[in-house]
């Protein structure tokens, strides 16, 4: 399962820019990767982990702006079509999971 966080935060004043930067840094600290400047994603071990991450994000919400959280399956993630300029990028693949024993 994949978790995608999309947000649109105000960055007009220096304080708003600082708040938005802090929110982005918090996502990176939680293991999210930046897809676009306001779109971050991460692989979850299962649906059970989703609620914990949503709780953490809720605790870090800035006072203004909009934040959306999406949860998608591995298959839906692999079906994402991405372009860089006019060039289609390769389909995304789920990273292999390490087995520890």
What are these regions (language model features)?
Residues 2-4, 10-101:
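Basic nucleic-acid-binding interfaces
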